[in-house]
């Protein structure tokens, strides 16, 4: 029972960065759903899967402290434990009705996107294929992303895998699942076909013209990474890292993105003119718009996140 789930959890985290074996997401889901459906203890199976897979994926936050990583890993395990229990219960009650089980999958994905602590949307199954498809010549994958979005794409991946699992496990209902698969493919390819036709022939909007823009994401660094590490002028040095990397950009770009905490405190463009002036110089040189993340203190022990958009004239919009 747990062997399938353990294999599934290992394949799952291997499909995510930094390992990037994106194609392992498919056998991972196969072993997960088959493991849950065959398990006599679906809660335990879900718990094992969630704790192992997300424990590895989230391991980076141990730089904050193990008191952050361990509870969150256990919480994800409990979340998948309840999911496994509910999934098996509904499967038994509905005699493995494919479309009802899809409803359970989509409801859980929606819950996980917002809970706990604001959700974990980049842990979706489709996330691994955002970069994975670039390693293939299968150009349909970007179109699926554009048509259904990452959440819808995740549901498609999981639903197709579940359909294969049910087809393998349920010998007496193969004809039923063949009919279900036909309906499911019609539901998928109807909007996808419309999207591809419009993308190719511009059927729905004659005035719509696609235009590429050049975007640069500037990822600076801290001289002392980790929440427990401290060094002198850390925030100033983080800002300097971003501005210096931006100065190394040699050609004009449409949009420059600085991530969260790249500015703030004593380096806030809204408060400190020298910081805004530094950025305006780069705006003029690169003829770029800037999207900048930062944080500022609001009380002695608290801070708030902010985002700034600076147009190509150097004005904060």
Residue locations for each model-derived region?
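Membrane-embedded alpha-helical bundles of multi-pass enzymes
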Residues: 1-202
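Soluble catalytic regions of membrane-associated enzymes that act on cell-envelope
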Residues: 197-317
């Amino acid at each position: 029972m747990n062997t399938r789930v353990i294999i599934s959890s290992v394949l799952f985290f291997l499909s995510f960065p930094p390992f990037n074996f994106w194609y392992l997401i498919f056998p991972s889901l196969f072993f997960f759903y088959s493991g849950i459906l065959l398990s006599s203890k679906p809660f335990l199976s879900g718990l094992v899967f969630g704790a192992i897979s997300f424990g590895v994926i989230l391991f980076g936050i141990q730089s904050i402290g193990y008191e952050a990583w361990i509870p969150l890993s256990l919480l994800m395990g409990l979340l998948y434990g309840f999911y496994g229990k509910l999934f098996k219960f509904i499967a038994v009650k509905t005699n493995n009705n494919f479309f009802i089980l899809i409803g359970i999958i989509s409801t859980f994905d929606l819950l996980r996107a917002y809970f706990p602590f604001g959700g974990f949307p980049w842990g979706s199954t489709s996330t691994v294929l955002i970069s994975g498809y670039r390693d293939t010549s299968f150009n349909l994958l970007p179109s699926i992303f554009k048509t259904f979005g990452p959440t819808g794409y995740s549901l498609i991946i999981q639903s197709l895998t579940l359909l294969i699992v049910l087809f393998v496990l349920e010998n007496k209902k193969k004809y039923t699942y063949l009919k279900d698969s036909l309906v499911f493919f019609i539901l998928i390819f109807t909007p996808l076909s419309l999207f591809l036709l419009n993308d190719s022939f511009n059927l729905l909007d004659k005035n719509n013209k696609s235009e590429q823009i050049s975007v640069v994401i500037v990822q600076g660094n801290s001289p002392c990474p980790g929440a427990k590490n401290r060094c002198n002028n850390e925030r100033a040095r983080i800002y300097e890292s971003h501005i210096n990397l931006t100065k190394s950009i040699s050609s004009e770009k449409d949009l420059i993105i600085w991530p969260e905490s790249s500015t703030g405190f004593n380096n806030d463009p809204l408060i400190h003119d020298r910081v805004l002036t530094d950025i305006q110089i780069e705006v003029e040189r690169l003829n770029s718009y800037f999207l900048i993340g930062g944080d500022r203190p609001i009380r002695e022990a608290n801070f708030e996140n902010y985002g700034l958009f600076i147009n190509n004239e150097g004005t904060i919009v």
